[in-house]
């Protein structure tokens, strides 16, 4: 005696696709974290992007001097 309503015991295709996407994103995040921990936080794209983001938040540096050789 089946406990399902409607007779189809298989899960919905949409639900399976949703779980597959969430699972793959979770694996991707874990692999990226492992990669970042293995190589360290060197001068890579993520570190440069964070540095640019922090510089944009802090605003322009007023004490910076420009060397002009003319």
Swiss-Prot record:
Tell where it localizes. Virion membrane
Keyword set for this entry? Answer: Membrane, Transmembrane, Transmembrane helix, Viral envelope protein, Virion
Q: Where are the transmembrane segments?
A: 14-34
Membrane topology note = Single-pass membrane protein
A single GO CC term for this protein reads: membrane
The name on file for this protein is Uncharacterized protein UL74A
